[in-house]
UniProtKB/Swiss-Prot annotation:
This is Whey acidic protein. It comes from Oryctolagus cuniculus (Rabbit). The gene is WAP. It comes from the Eukaryota. PROSITE patterns: WAP (PS51390). GO terms for molecular function: peptidase inhibitor activity.
Length: 127
């Protein structure tokens, strides 16, 4: 019985720790969609809107609309990696599909035969 109680308390502590851990949030831009005639909820700021809607400019001043989320492009370019000349299919699984899935400054780049999180090559600007 003591083992079950200890296990339950351990699981509760783990759940609490995971809930407090900072989550990775990729940088994004929020854009307002084109206004439609069916939108009637007027607003002055995002605080006037419900749920995930935001206050967007409209002919009436402002209306609550569901925003368009656009990923912010990351700096740099992917390093060049020569693909191996293999006669068989690649059996590696990709780690990512686009840059928004990568932490920090890393980019989602082709490496050998799958997509990987890689450090970008930053272009130097001529002075």
């Amino acid at each position: 019985m003591r083992c079950l109680i200890s296990l339950a308390l351990g699981l509760l502590a783990l759940e609490a720790a995971l809930a407090l851990a900072p989550k990775f949030i990729a940088p994004v831009q929020v854009m307002c969609p084109e206004p439609s005639s069916s939108e009637e909820t007027l607003c002055l700021s995002d605080n006037d809107c419900l749920g995930s809607t935001v206050c967007c400019p409209s002919a009436a001043g402002g209306s609550c609309r569901t925003p368009i989320i656009v990923p912010t492009p990351k700096a740099g370019r992917c390093p060049w990696v020569q693909a191996p000349m293999l006669s068989q299919l690649c059996e590696e699984l990709s780690d990512c599909a686009n840059d928004i899935e990568c932490r920090g400054d890393k980019k989602c780049c082709f490496s050998r035969c799958a997509m990987r999180y890689l450090e970008p090559i930053l272009e130097s600007t001529p002075q």
